[in-house]
């Protein structure tokens, strides 16, 4: 017989200030979740108990660094809920320090820890903001360690909303493989568990008729399929993942992000992500993300 907890799904959203938590929370609200922002950790378990009593099916909760003194309670609270059979997913939104500084500078909003940082620093306003961001990283390190990280440094708000919805739609007890293409020239994704460098493979960019296309287009796919090194790289990545995915699933990992990088994030990495998602789609839940094809700055709300 199922308990009442079996019908309750909880998504906890934490992360860096300015990383897009409000965008993610709005996405879940649109998906039918009952959403609460800035819930103090002390009220987390009582709030969940209340939702069980009301037979709420799906709840999304956002917490941030303003309750830093109580955040160490959260990992144990999540473990308690999981032991009760509650479906829990924890998402941590992140971005590079430079990206967060730019977002705050553009909107002229104040970081929630900026006062604490500036009290102990004679440096200018930008330095105080960087200090606040780095302090926040330290305070949230444990939450980041135990969550699925989403790097929002280069992503449109609409794409972030769609990505969050796709993540929460997967079964919580099953490992989900996220394949992500990216360009090394724009940095390695901060949410990657494994990174494969494919810049040594033949580059369609130097074929004039393929330059403006992407790895999702048939002419590019046909070109890369004919390259022996591309087939060998695909085989080696497939073997590596097949070797370790079972162990990761047994370790109760909910998500594993595999990032494939080339120079521009347009041809080779995109093609390999498409192929890997196809190869692993029968055995695992798979999601695809092409960072550079979706790239656009995210702004604060």
Swiss-Prot record:
SUPFAM superfamilies: P-loop containing nucleoside triphosphate hydrolases
InterPro entries per record: P-loop_NTPase, RapZ-like, RapZ-like_N, RapZ_C
Chain positions recorded as ATP binding sites: 15-22
UniProt keywords, alphabetically: ATP-binding, GTP-binding, Nucleotide-binding
Residues reported in the UniProt entry to bind GTP: 64-67
Keyword Nucleotide-binding: yes
Pfam families given in the database record: PapZ_C, RapZ-like_N
Gene Ontology terms for molecular function: ATP binding; GTP binding
Family: Belongs to the RapZ-like family.
Name listed for the protein in its UniProt record: Nucleotide-binding protein Rfer_1653
Species annotation: Albidiferax ferrireducens (strain ATCC BAA-621 / DSM 15236 / T118)
